[in-house]
């Protein structure tokens, strides 16, 4: 049982036969899918049952899937990366491996209290900065605003008024100091949201995450959300209060066809978590009939954006936004709904209740899937804890592929912890990334070996008329290993898309291929079988999003032309041709100058270590000729940087060891200079004794007490050893002097 299965307490019936009104029922498929689950249907961890259940789409092979997208008020962090990479992997597997026809919907929450508050904060800070820059603005205009911001109070009306007064004073003094004098929260919040939405989508592109089939923005859905809420009111499951609208949980709960808290009933006790879902600018709880009622429409207060509605100007609550947008695309029956486990309550719980109230149905979503938490050193990411790692920051340390491997090595539904590696206050990496980097290197080296072996046979395409293809025992063993890997991968895919299990099976196949290549003479390799293994590994990695679906062997991600004409060919070949010409010119110049072998070898090393890596080529020197390997230039640069860092550390260690050895030698020589008769009268012995015999051996301690016989015997041994070292020193000094005299 995985960690994700253990973390769900069992709250309700697990199947349709366990209770008169089950919390979840297996989906009733349409005629196109009446035969039940496909033989190869995966079993998904369903948050309704907290168990793995067979996946059965409602409409044959078509899958309607909605996931909660970002609330765009800040930069995306590693927690977002894990969530969206995991859903990208699951989506790719469902589409490319299981061959479902997936309609994938993601929303963008661009109306939210956090965005509104951040927009006001940025405006206020910009005005204070402008006032400070131009100078001469009265303190009576800046001090109240600074005090309000410092207090942490969420009085946006006062904040807006104070900021506007300061803006007017700045404009009166310098009209050019402010570029947007007519700023209003109605437009300002959306400008902020658009900025972070664009950044988020670029982050997703950089991470190799496929775009959704439909993107729904809250700001484009306000009219439909109002209509959606009205239907819920008309059905008797919501009520208006002081211009806001609330969902009536007790009425919904008492209806025979409905159940509230299907996902996590225990979470109802967490009032703080429920209130957090209402937003930072929520109205007084006294407006609600019951404590568990939640807001569908918020009456806007001064300083807050607003849209028209039958209940007065306001804006949608967080939960209703997803219900309305998902329903608009997928309707009253959704195959899969998903998001991070932190959205389980109250967001997804309320989303279900609203939608089932709107359609007056028992079950709106058939499978709820949640990705596991990602923590930093066991703590939730927070700027106040200084453990907030953005996607952009992570991509400066690792490639997108390496980060994806990190997540693939952990089950998507399990919690995950990252341990930062720090130099001072700066995070330079994560301990868990070491396994991901090693995994990537394992696959890269595997593809290099396969393609190198095929090139060595003169049949890079896997076939040559001159190559023998008859199988021997080694080929039969490798064939069995390929079959075993296929079975292992398939079993892992069926088991809740168990990506660690998939990687494990692929690594076992790599081990079998490496064993085959080591056992068979290079000229006797059977290329078709070897190519089959390479293509299978490539295909599965493509399903996981770490390889390109080019039809070839390898991870891909190698730039170059598209083969579409002379221009693209020239553009692709230009860097390599430039390198060849430069190298030829350098070698010719060295030859004409009569350069020695070392200079020519340095030029060759420069091409290997600098020129070729910039083209994405790694050159391995070996007996019988060098072997070239194609790689991502950025990965080669990082590999070179790691090697340089390791070399520098090794050299620094050698330097320290050399200094330490020199220090010890100097100390030893200094001690050897001391005559044995003077040994116990100086240094560490200086204050230990008061009387000595004729040979300088101590006879009495510093208090005048005569030393014991055993103690004197021990000191005599020390003095004898010193005499040997001193005699060596004198002999060496005499020899050195004799050498100088001879010269």
Set out the residue ranges of the language-model regions:
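Structural preference for alpha-helix termini/caps and helix-kink/transition segments
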Residues: 2-30, 389-743
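Alpha-helical recognition segments enriched in aromatics with Gly/Pro capping
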Residues: 2-73, 87-88, 195, 199-207, ...
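Short glycine/proline-rich turn/loop motifs
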Residues: 68, 176-183, 300-308, 486-489, ...
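Short, well-structured beta-strand/strand-turn elements
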Residues: 100-103, 235-242, 615-620
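Short, glycine/charge-rich beta-strand/loop segments that flank catalytic centers
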Residues: 105-113, 133, 213-225, 243-252
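Long, charged, glycine-rich C-terminal linkers/tails
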Residues: 214-215, 367-372, 621-626
